[in-house]
Regions:
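Short loop/turn segments immediately following the C-termini of beta-strands
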Residues: 23
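A conserved beta-turn-beta hairpin within the catalytic core of GNAT-like acetyltransferases
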Residues: 26-28
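Unchanged
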Residues: 37-128
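Conserved N-terminal beta-strand and adjoining loop/helix that marks the start
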Residues: 1-18, 36-39
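Short acidic/polar alpha-helix capping motifs at helix-coil junctions
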Residues: 12-16, 83-85, 143-144
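Charged phosphate-binding loop/patch that engages nucleotide di/tri-phosphates or the phosphate backbone
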Residues: 122-146
């Protein structure tokens, strides 16, 4: 079985804060904007589309400065998509340009907030994604999430 190609955005603003969004389908579950890439899209095209869809942010509102990945996780049984075993994610760190408005009132997220990376809690992430988030925080911020 294959892994579904996926991209995720870690958006930063001056002061070192990052944007996290609470999922609409799971209360108290926070994550970065992310989504699957279509076969005919580059990772950057997929990132721009997903960010626009999920937080209404146009590409000219941020600048990608770093990326790491891919990171893999396996879907829980019954949650497989498109015949895939799991997801293979590339994470992109981007800086806000100016003070863009973040809009999250949609099917993906119910709200958003800016936090310092060291205040992120692994319990906010569904168990299946926790190893990926631990690796992401280690790679981007040199933070070990317990």
């Amino acid at each position: 079985m294959k892994f579904r190609r996926n991209v995720a955005l870690i958006l930063t603003r001056p002061g070192g804060e990052i944007l996290v969004c609470e999922r609409s389908d799971f209360k108290d579950s926070w994550q970065f904007p992310q989504g699957g890439a279509k076969d005919d899209e580059s990772d950057i095209e997929a990132l721009q589309r997903e960010v626009r869809e999920e937080i209404a942010l146009p590409p000219e509102s941020y600048r990608v400065v770093l990326h790491h990945g891919p990171y893999r996780y396996i879907f829980r049984s019954g949650f497989r998509k498109e015949g895939c075993l799991g997801q293979e994610q590339t994470y992109y760190l981007a800086e806000c340009l100016g003070s863009p408005e973040i809009v999250v009132d949609n099917k993906e997220f119910r709200r958003s907030r800016w936090i310092k990376p060291e205040t992120f809690r692994i319990k906010w992430v569904p168990p299946v994604k926790r190893d990926v988030y631990r690796a992401v925080f280690r790679d981007f911020f040199r933070i070990e999430l317990a």
